[in-house]
Design a protein with these regions (language model features):
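AAA+ P-loop NTPase nucleotide-binding core of proteostasis motors
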Residues: 1-216, 221
Length: 223
């Protein structure tokens, strides 16, 4: 479902059906750790821009206090760090064709959302040095663990085959994620997101080929 949802949004962009002033795509990838949110983001960067280095990752846990927000977008004149520029805006300015991954967005201070609203609305942002940074060619992805804390708990009673149990767990997780997001994020933020994608937990049959792929990649690097 995640791959299909992203593919639909990218096709709309390439067909010219999106607002040209906004980023190429904006998504929330929700789900517990280890379900492939970051891996899909890397694959998307490589597919769209030919290089997985086109993925710009921002750990939002580093911006949970108000005084840290200026590091992301650049300090105002006269403040410490003014000459360095923002850690996000500088990277996007140098690489405007990229996937920008805001990891665990729920950990960020509310001032981050205020600043990002301009990006989601207008596809641009003015950094601390007064330079306009263009986000219109970026795909923006927010990851979140909201609502996934207790999804491993079994649901239902009696006999239930694994397929039905997995589907029941997934539906329960979707509901919890969407309820949690409505409580945590402001409506004006959620309304500017193209799609909220809830990742399924990986089954054993899915984990094995993923592990094999990572081992092969490690062997290739060693060679």
């Amino acid at each position: 479902e995640a791959v299909q949802a992203v593919a639909r949004a990218i096709r709309r962009t390439r067909a010219g059906l999106k607002d040209p002033k906004r980023p190429a795509g904006t998504f929330i990838f929700a789900g517990p750790s280890g379900v492939g949110k970051t891996e899909l983001s890397k694959a998307l960067a490589e597919f769209l821009f030919g290089d997985d280095d086109a993925l710009i990752t921002v750990d939002m846990g580093e911006y949970h206090d108000s005084y840290q927000v200026s590091r992301l977008f650049g300090s105002a004149p006269g403040y410490v760090g003014y000459e360095e520029g923002g850690q996000l805006t500088e990277k996007v300015r140098r690489r405007p064709f990229s996937v920008v991954l805001f990891d665990e967005i729920e950990k960020a201070h509310e001032r981050v959302y205020d600043s990002l609203m301009q990006v989601l609305d207008e596809g641009r942002m003015t950094d601390g040095q007064g330079r306009e940074v263009d986000f219109r060619n970026t795909v923006i992805i927010f990851t979140s663990n909201i609502g996934t804390q207790d999804i491993s708990k079994p649901v239902g009673m009696g006999f239930q085959d694994s397929k039905n149990a997995n589907e029941s767990n997934y539906q329960r997780m979707q509901n919890k994620v969407r309820e949690g997001m409505k409580k945590h994020f402001r409506p004006e933020f959620l309304n500017r997101i193209d799609d909220v994608i809830v990742f399924r937990q990986l089954t054993e049959d899915e984990i094995l080929p993923v592990s094999y792929t990572h081992l092969r990649a490690h062997e290739t690097r060693e060679d």
